[in-house]
Amino acid sequence: MKSVLYSYILFLSCIIINGRDIAPHAPSDGKCKDNEYKRHNLCPGTYASRLCDSKTNTQCTPCGSGTFTSRNNHLPACLSCNGRRDRVTLLTIESVNALPDIIVFSKDHPDARHVFPKQNVE
């Protein structure tokens, strides 16, 4: 009977622990663990504008014009699209208003892309 009771308590504990919202995340050595972000555990296209602490989650902010990120990150800012062209593909397209736009595709992460007006990129 005791083993059934202990098993039941263990089972309920697992449900309670796994079923609850585990946010906010406690920092580990001053940094959040990998993938501890509020947007589906991902931060591509955003940067960590505020790292988590014991009371709040990491806050992700979208990258601005001419910048991008393609992976989960703890970066305090987005990367410039004018940087390492060997890792980034730039594609010019014609927009509806006939002004060319730039789409940035990361070779490491082809799903991550950012579109912005060409006039903002040199």
Swiss-Prot record:
Protein's UniProt keywords contain Translocase: no
TNFR-Cys repeat residues: 42-81
Keyword set includes Ribonucleoprotein: no
Cysteine pairs bridged by disulfides in the record: 43-52, 60-78, 63-81
Assigned keywords, A-Z: Disulfide bond
Top-level division of the source organism's lineage: Viruses
Inducing or repressing factors: Expressed in the early phase of the viral replicative cycle.
Main function: The protein is truncated in this strain and presumably inactive. It has similarities with variola virus CrmB, but the product is truncated due to several premature stop codon.
The protein's name: Truncated CrmB protein
The gene coding this protein: OPG022
